[in-house]
Each structure stands twice: as C-alpha cells, then as structure tokens.
Amino acid sequence: MSPQTETKASVGFKAGVKEYKLTYYTPEYQTKDTDILAAFRVTPQPGVPPEEAGAAVAAESSTGTWTTVWTDGLTSLDRYKGRCYRIERVVGEKDQYIAYVAYPLDLFEEGSVTNMFTSIVGNVFGFKALRALRLEDLRIPPAYVKTFQGPPHGIQVERDKLNKYGRPLLGCTIKPKLGLSAKNYGRAVYECLRGGLDFTKDDENVNSQPFMRWRDRFLFCAEALYKAQTETGEIKGHYLNATAGTCEEMIKRAVFARELGVPIVMHDYLTGGFTANTSLAHYCRDNGLLLHTHRAMHAVIDRQKNHGIHFRVLAKALRMSGGDHIHSGTVVGKLEGERDITLGFVDLLRDDFVEQDRSRGIYFTQDWVSLPGVLPVASGGIHVWHMPALTEIFGDDSVLQFGGGTLGHPWGNAPGAVANRLALEACVQARNEGRDLAQEGNEIIREACKWSPELAAACQVWKEIVFNFAAVDVLDK
C-alpha cells in the first residue's frame, strides 16, 4: 500500500465505536415538509442519557449500525440519516422521554407501508440500550401520502353505493364465531339483515375451516343478502372474509365475491399483512368492492403504554394501505378505548386535515391531501342501552356493530336487529330535534320502548350490563 493511500485512509476513516448522539442527535435541525416525523416514547436503560437513547433510535431505524463502517464514506449520511431533533421528559413518569425523529423521504419506497414500518419499527425495538420503546405517532408528509391509493372507495362513495345517508350504519357479527354450518350461518345473516341491519359480518377468524368452507359460506351469505334486499328494498351487505394463507388464495376469494355481485369483502389487515392488504385494496377499487378491515392482533402491538405501536399509527397505516372500514373500539363497550384518544384517531381516519392536539394524543398536524376517509367501526360488548352514547361519540360517519347485542335477543336474531334499528332511529331523531344524547339517552330509549316490544325486551335483558374497567392506555397528565 502506498504512503499516499495510507494517509487518505487515516483521514477519511477511523475504525471503532462512537456515541450515537455525536452523529444522530441534532437539536438544531429544522424539519422539512417532506420529512416523515416520528414521536417515540423512550425508556432508556439505567445510565443511558436520553440524548443517546433518542439518537440510537434515529440511527438504528435509519442508516446507523453499532460501529463505524468503511462504506459510510460511499454515501452522504447527512442526506439519508434519521435525526433525533427534540427530546421531552414525560411528566409523571420516571425515566420516560418523547424523542422526536425526522426521516428523509428518500429512505422509503413509494406506496409501501411494509417498507415504511420495516425501517421505522424494525430492529430498533429490540435494542439493548432501551428498556422499552413505543411509537406514539407519525407525520406522513403530503409528498409521501400521494404515492398511496388509500381506501378503495371512501366514505362518500360508500354512502352513494348503499344509498344511505344521515345516520350511522348498523352491523352485526355472526355468533358463535366458529362452528356453524354454512347454511345455518346464512340463515342468521338473513334474519339480521331482514330485521333492519345494513351489514352482517364474518368474525375475524372465520376463513375456511372444516366445518364451513369459504365457498359454501359465500354462496349462502349471498343468497341471504339478496333475499333480504328483495324483502326490505334496502341495499344490504355481508363482510365476506377473504383472508387466507396466501395472497393468491385471498384474491381468488375476492374474485368469487365479485362474481356473486356482493358489495363488500373483508380482510384481517394485521395478521394478513400490509402487502396483502394493499394488494386487496387495489383489487377492490378496480372491481367496485368495498373493503372492511379488522384489526385482529392489534392489542398485542398497541395496548401497553410504554412499549409497542400506538393504534393511531396503525390507523394511519391502514388509511394508507387501504380499507373502507376499520374497527376502532367503542369507548363504552368491552374493549380497550379511552374517549379522547379514540376520538383523536377517529378524526385521523375520517378527516382530510387534522391539527396537532396533544390533549387527544395527536403529536403532529396531518394533511391527508384528499386521500379518501375510512369509516370507524364501533364493535365489542355493545347493546341498545349504549346506542345514545355511540351515536353521540361517533356521529353519522361510522358503523355501529352489535354481535351479541343482536343475536342475544331473547326472541331471536330478527327481533334483535329490529331492536337495534329502532334504537338507532330514535337516537338520530332525538339528536336532530336538538336533544342531548349524553344527558337524555336513557330516557330516549325508554320512550322508544313504548312503540317497540322488541326494543323493550332487549332493554330488559341488558339493563345491568356494563364494562367498568379503567383503560390501560391513557393520556399523559
């Protein structure tokens, strides 16, 4: 090796390990409109300064590795590296910090939620220097949003397809979720739709099991919804779950649903994966199918306050990947969901522009630049007594889904559907007349019971059923 080469090497590269904060902690950095911004809740190991922890997150989720490497000199780290540009201590929590990280847009493949998550939440969550790490929020810049198709159709197109306006939509998950034959399953679908519901639904784990193969279920459900449509004069739908073991099989099931002429299919977007979900969303737009997405497995990822990914991030990812509906919790039912947090990500699903609002857990202003909106689905442990609260909390652009709250009616499935439809109509009418659903809800339901024995029977069964448990994931004080 010549002396000149040795001299250049000694100047251009110095082997060894150096602190992340020397390269990746840049409090002077001014974020760009094209940056993807992330807010991480960081819990460092004892003895690790917060600046080093935040810089480590920025490094390990972008260009960094544990040691200096020769090939750093072959690219521009200043152009491609993530930067931890701000750190806040979490009030009321010991050794917890919010680290803000900016990522250059060139780090991400266009139109790929899969690639975005692989970078931002890939290896870094197993990093030993951190006791815990949670991704609280993302700011997706308009330049990146515009590379996604998003929901196949969106809220307004769905309403136009269904010809239903001015109220929430009503649904029901068929129970028991497993074990019914296809014919008995179709019977339950017919009874619920005939009783007044807009939708019925496959449960998330109904795919193609020995007791009910997918093709048989699709056929009996299509027969049921067409019969109910003929008798009621309303457009009906059943969420036919197309989730399968391979993308090819999933698309095959969606093709069969399209051939049957049904309006909507379903996908478990977290267990199925973002690549599969985006593929199905593209198929649904091209072929006029609505897409209902279920968030099965979400609580494994989002429920713990100090580690994982907050659901508001998963909701944003779903809007980008594509889905016309997404389960969002109920606030009042059996599943986790604090009111302000829930309404925060509901707005992120539906609205075109959402301002930063830390009181609702929204860390960044989000501009969706006309990406279609997603209907939030309130489902899980709800019944007729919850109808006023659900109508007040979620408003018209939502789906209120009663499984046990329909099929558990003492008189059967159809009366259960009648009870829910009448409770909803009573709440919408009362709201339109200027009544306060939050204060007068129970009285509104009692008044409606005078005109509906089905509703009165439902109210009697569920009058004392409540789920009074404190939420695990709550806002910081």
Swiss-Prot record:
PTM-bearing positions, type N6,N6,N6-trimethyllysine: 14
GO biological process, one term: reductive pentose-phosphate cycle
EC number: 4.1.1.39
Catalytic activity reported: 2 (2R)-3-phosphoglycerate + 2 H(+) = D-ribulose 1,5-bisphosphate + CO2 + H2O; D-ribulose 1,5-bisphosphate + O2 = 2-phosphoglycolate + (2R)-3-phosphoglycerate + 2 H(+)
Keyword list, A-Z: Acetylation, Calvin cycle, Carbon dioxide fixation, Chloroplast, Disulfide bond, Lyase, Magnesium, Metal-binding, Methylation, Monooxygenase, Oxidoreductase, Photorespiration, Photosynthesis, Plastid
Enzyme's top EC category: lyase
Positions of the catalytic residues: 175 (proton acceptor), 294 (proton acceptor)
Location, primary (coarse class): plastid
GO cellular component: chloroplast
Reported modifications of this chain: The disulfide bond which can form in the large chain dimeric partners within the hexadecamer appears to be associated with oxidative stress and protein turnover.
Transmembrane segments: none
Binding site for Mg(2+): 201, 203-204
Keyword Lyase: yes
Binding site for substrate: 123, 173, 177, 295, 327, 379
Cofactor binding note from Swiss-Prot or TrEMBL: Binds 1 Mg(2+) ion per subunit.
HAMAP family: RuBisCO_L_type1
Assembly behavior: Heterohexadecamer of 8 large chains and 8 small chains; disulfide-linked. The disulfide link is formed within the large subunit homodimers.
Entry function: RuBisCO catalyzes two reactions: the carboxylation of D-ribulose 1,5-bisphosphate, the primary event in carbon dioxide fixation, as well as the oxidative fragmentation of the pentose substrate in the photorespiration process. Both reactions occur simultaneously and in competition at the same active site.
Name by which UniProt lists this protein: Ribulose bisphosphate carboxylase large chain
